[in-house]
């Protein structure tokens, strides 16, 4: 279980009072749970992911994973248990390397190998990883990532992020920069990977349809607080219009 306990975060403000994002925020997320997080800009969604990943430090509070505190664990050490896919398709991959080389690097993540050994992997094994991917990545194993489309790069980032079997996967608006068709293909791939590998997943999104259609649970943040938290039948019966009404009420 991923537990966020009494989390607070403030940023210094040279012109006055500190900018408080969270104050005593607490959320428990079950193992394998796929949680969509929505809310207006500036409400703390990406900040929450940044704190969980170790990119920024919380002001106070605690984060535990499977009853082990990771609050003081360095970011580079958290990468062994926490993977992340960003909104920008150019992040999360090495653009000057081929698809094959990127996958090989991800497969050897955390191993004490030199680069030459890291990049060795059998073609059959790599092709198997790309089976059923609608964006034709299998055909581009020996193409440099910089020549792929945004959707292909984001799909590759997703696959790479899951290869080391992380305990937690953080998705930061990972379909926002894609066209509608490609966005739907990437979210379908996301759901497939999360379900098959049973990864505890937090997905920040502005796409309310995706937030309702995918995932086990929906959380809405507003001014650093949870103003909506639904799952199961309650989530299934929720509509986009009802979410918008709740958002307007929170504002």
UniProtKB/Swiss-Prot annotation:
This is Tyrosine transport ATP-binding protein. GO terms for molecular function: ATP binding; ATP hydrolysis activity. Its EC number is 7.4.2.13. GO terms for cellular component: plasma membrane. Probably part of an ABC transporter complex involved in tyrosine uptake. May also import phenylalanine. Probably responsible for energy coupling to the transport system. Disulfide bonds: none annotated. It holds the Pfam family ABC_tran. Disruption phenotype: C.difficile isolates lacking CDR20291_0805 and CDR20291_0806 show reduced uptake of tyrosine. Production of the tyrosine catabolic end product p-cresol is decreased by sixfold, and the intermediate fermentation product (4-hydroxyphenyl)acetate is not detectable at all. Its main location: membrane. It comes from Clostridioides difficile (strain R20291).
């Amino acid at each position: 279980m991923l537990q966020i306990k009494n989390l607070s975060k403030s940023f210094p403000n040279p012109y006055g009072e500190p900018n408080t994002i969270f104050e005593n925020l607490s959320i428990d997320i079950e193992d394998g749970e796929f949680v969509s997080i929505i809310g207006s800009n500036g409400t703390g969604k990406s900040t929450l992911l940044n704190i969980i990943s170790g990119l920024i430090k919380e002001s106070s509070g605690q984060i535990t994973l499977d009853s082990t505190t990771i609050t003081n664990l360095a970011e580079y050490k958290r990468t062994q248990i926490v993977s992340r896919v960003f909104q920008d398709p150019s992040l999360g991959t090495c653009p000057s390397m081929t698809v094959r080389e990127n996958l090989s690097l991800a497969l050897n993540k955390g191993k004490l190998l030199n680069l030459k050994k890291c990049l060795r992997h059998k073609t059959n094994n790599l092709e198997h990883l790309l089976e059923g991917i609608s964006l034709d990545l299998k055909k581009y194993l020996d193409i440099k990532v910089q020549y792929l489309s945004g959707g292909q790069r984001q799909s590759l980032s997703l696959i790479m992020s899951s290869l080391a079997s992380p305990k937690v996967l953080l998705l930061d608006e990972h379909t926002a920069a894609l066209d509608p068709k490609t966005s739907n293909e990437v979210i379908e791939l996301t759901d497939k990977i999360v379900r098959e590998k049973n990864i505890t997943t937090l997905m920040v999104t502005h796409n309310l349809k995706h937030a309702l259609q995918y995932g086990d649970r929906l959380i809405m943040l507003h001014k650093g607080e949870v103003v909506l938290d639904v799952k199961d039948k309650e989530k299934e019966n929720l509509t986009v219009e009802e979410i918008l009404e709740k958002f307007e009420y929170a504002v």
